[in-house]
Amino acid sequence: MTSPASGDDYAPIPRSALGPALNDQGYYVGRVERNLYYVTDGVYQSAFLTTPDGVVVFDAPPSIGHNLRRAVDQITAAEGMPNTVTHLVYSHHHADHGGAAFLFDGDVTRIGHEETRRLLLRDGDPARPVPEVTFADRYTLGRR
């Protein structure tokens, strides 16, 4: 029989491994590069890209939920860019990555792999609307 582990059995977690400090609303938004940002609640992440035509959001975890919208509004206001979310890209179909996708309704175009679409149709979850645009191997969004 084994005994349960105690706090003395593990090395302390280094402060740098804890991630960035969250604001009073429970999220942190950081710049990856130029107009690409990430948002975290300390567990899950999302990302968004600001453009002159609007914002492209990558994943919408329910644990971040409305804070994702707040982060988009905060950054676009500071950068003088439009805050309209025009596209939402699903990384995959799991609810822990797309469960707040319903918050971005209206004219948003949802993009996902064709298998993501199939699985979202199967699941029938209204919080995760099915992507209108799908791809098999790759998809390019925007002008080239």
Predicted regions and their residues:
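N-terminal pre-domain segments of enzymes
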Residues: 1-26
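A general marker of short, structured functional hotspots
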Residues: 6, 23, 33-34, 100, ...
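Hydrophobic small-molecule pocket/channel-lining residues, especially in calycin-type beta-barrels
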Residues: 8, 64, 128
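Phosphate-binding glycine-rich loops and adjacent basic patches that engage nucleotide phosphates
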Residues: 9-11, 28-38, 98, 125
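Active-site HxH/HxHxD metal-binding segment of metal-dependent hydrolases
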Residues: 20, 67, 73-143
